[in-house]
Amino acid sequence: KHGSPGSYISYMKNKILTGLNKKDSHLNPFLQHIFLGYYQSDNAFPYMTSKNKLDIPMTEGSILNLDNIYSYDVVSLSNIFDWSSDTIVKTHARYLSQMKKGSSIIIRQINNHKNWIEIFNDYFTEDKNFDSYWQEHDRSMFYDHIRLFIRK
């Protein structure tokens, strides 16, 4: 919705080429998965092979249907708003405003430069350094922005 019509193929091509030109691109597990179909290291994502059992419950469905959003410390939204109208984003912002002070929302955006803080700013502040850091260090390569909003 927010990217230019017909722009996704060239967008992805440019992101992959940029990733290939980075130092140690051969170690990037996302590029390995694209070109090899597997990860060269069993430890590509250390949290997946942790000796400590991570008990993370799976939640499937709309975030708006969670009865206990206030109990979450972090909500991570990947590409959710890339295809959403401002009305839908405003609905989510109001709902997520139930989160406790200091909790965070991570918003990842593909082919989209809209800064959603304009809609969230009644409830959240943005850590702009977070986005700058991940624009430089994100190994997945595809995101234009990884924004961090912190509940006021």
PLM segments and residue spans:
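A short acidic, Gly/Pro-enriched loop at the edge of an enzyme's catalytic core
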Residues: 64-76
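Class I S-adenosyl-L-methionine-dependent methyltransferase module
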Residues: 1-50
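Short, aromatic/basic amphipathic alpha-helical patches
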Residues: 116-124
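Conserved beta-strand signature within the Rossmann-like core of class I S-adenosyl-L-methionine
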Residues: 101-114
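Adenosine-cofactor binding site in Rossmann-like domains, unifying the SAM/SAH pocket
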Residues: 47-66
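A short glycine-rich, Lys/Arg-flanked "PGG" loop and its adjoining helix->strand segment in the class I
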Residues: 88-104
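Core SAM-dependent methyltransferase catalytic element
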Residues: 129-152
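Hydrophobic adenine-recognition pocket in adenosine-nucleotide-binding enzymes
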Residues: 80
